[in-house]
């Protein structure tokens, strides 16, 4: 078994909506990013890549490459997952924690779980997504951006 951890953060800027966990969420602010700014899928992709010792999202999809400008993070997750499967790994489970004062994530979490399960080709019970605040402390608490952490458990596929 192999465990990976991922972290991502994006500052608010411009106009909304935002995309988190593949879900378009109405909000007055947008997120500043080279791709679509999906902190949940970026952290998750990093966790999966880390567990497979394949580097990170920036190595695989560099923000200096114009090909990834405005990229759909679900597509990036699916491509990373293909590479991980090619190394002979299967998914144990993933756990994602979104850290944001606003907007409220709870109404969107069920759809995030559906999208992640679809993208990883796994069962819903292998995907957990939750959200928390920092009780108005730090940059997320001041409403300056959103952060996310994720962990992933991979196992070698049976031969």
From Swiss-Prot:
InterPro entries, per the entry: MECDP_synthase, MECDP_synthase_CS, MECDP_synthase_sf
One example GO MF annotation: metal ion binding
EC number(s) recorded for this UniProt protein: 4.6.1.12
Positions annotated to bind a divalent metal cation: 8, 10, 42
NCBIfam families for this protein: ispF
Function of the molecule: Involved in the biosynthesis of isopentenyl diphosphate (IPP) and dimethylallyl diphosphate (DMAPP), two major building blocks of isoprenoid compounds. Catalyzes the conversion of 4-diphosphocytidyl-2-C-methyl-D-erythritol 2-phosphate (CDP-ME2P) to 2-C-methyl-D-erythritol 2,4-cyclodiphosphate (ME-CPP) with a corresponding release of cytidine 5-monophosphate (CMP).
Protein name: 2-C-methyl-D-erythritol 2,4-cyclodiphosphate synthase
Organism of this sequence: Salmonella typhimurium (strain LT2 / SGSC1412 / ATCC 700720)
